[in-house]
């Protein structure tokens, strides 16, 4: 049986996860990073994307909206704006958010905060991508 480590995922409105896990895979700014027990210490930014979490025999997927990960000797902490399990995602709301972001990106550049619209589009696309695996 694989060694476990404590994984905490915290958002502004809740503790999304606080459990002993075997593995976590997150998307960092330099690519996907697999975290196991005794991983080297690190702090790095996260990209908007899916993450995988091995809890016992179950491999779970969740979305995270960027943030930071800190891997310590005792635990790993992810601080993110949002984290959701597939069953928590309101598909129609995510589709509407995606459509709004795409429409904003089509407007004149001077009228739109392009950076914010691109982030909104990435978040919506990420959420919808995870629901397709349900």
UniProtKB/Swiss-Prot annotation:
Stored InterPro entries: ATP_F1_dsu/esu_C_sf, ATP_synth_F1_dsu/esu, ATP_synth_F1_dsu/esu_N, ATP_synth_F1_esu_C, ATPsynth_dsu/esu_N
Domain of life: Bacteria
MF-aspect GO terms: ATP binding; proton-transporting ATP synthase activity, rotational mechanism
Gene3D superfamilies membership: ATP synthase delta/epsilon subunit, C-terminal domain (1.20.5.440), F0F1 ATP synthase delta/epsilon subunit, N-terminal (2.60.15.10)
Isomerase recorded as keyword: no
Keywords from the named record: ATP synthesis, Cell membrane, CF(1), Hydrogen ion transport, Ion transport, Membrane, Transport
Subcellular location: Cell membrane
Membrane disposition: Peripheral membrane protein
Any single GO CC term annotated in Swiss-Prot or TrEMBL for this entry: plasma membrane
Family the entry assigns: Belongs to the ATPase epsilon chain family.
Function of the protein: Produces ATP from ADP in the presence of a proton gradient across the membrane.
Quaternary assembly: F-type ATPases have 2 components, CF(1) - the catalytic core - and CF(0) - the membrane proton channel. CF(1) has five subunits: alpha(3), beta(3), gamma(1), delta(1), epsilon(1). CF(0) has three main subunits: a, b and c.
HAMAP family linked to this entry: ATP_synth_epsil_bac
Database matches in NCBIfam families: ATP_synt_epsi (TIGR01216), PRK00571.1-3 (NF001846), PRK13446.1 (NF009980)
Protein name (record): ATP synthase epsilon chain
Species the sequence originates in: Alkaliphilus metalliredigens (strain QYMF)
Phylogenetic placement of the source organism: Bacteria, Bacillati, Bacillota, Clostridia, Peptostreptococcales
Gene: atpC
């Amino acid at each position: 049986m694989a060694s476990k480590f404590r994984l905490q995922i915290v958002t502004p409105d809740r503790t999304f996860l606080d459990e002993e896990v075997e593995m976590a895979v997150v998307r960092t700014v330099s690519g996907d990073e697999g975290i196991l027990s005794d991983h080297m210490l690190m702090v790095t930014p996260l990209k908007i994307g899916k993450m995988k979490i091995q809890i016992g025999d179950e491999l779970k997927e969740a979305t995270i909206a960027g943030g930071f990960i800190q891997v310590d000797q005792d635990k790993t902490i992810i601080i993110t704006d949002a984290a959701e399990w597939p069953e928590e995602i309101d598909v129609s709301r995510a589709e509407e958010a995606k459509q709004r972001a795409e429409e904003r990106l089509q407007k004149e550049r001077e009228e739109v905060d392009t950076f914010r619209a691109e982030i909104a589009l990435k978040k919506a696309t990420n959420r919808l991508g995870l629901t397709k695996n349900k």
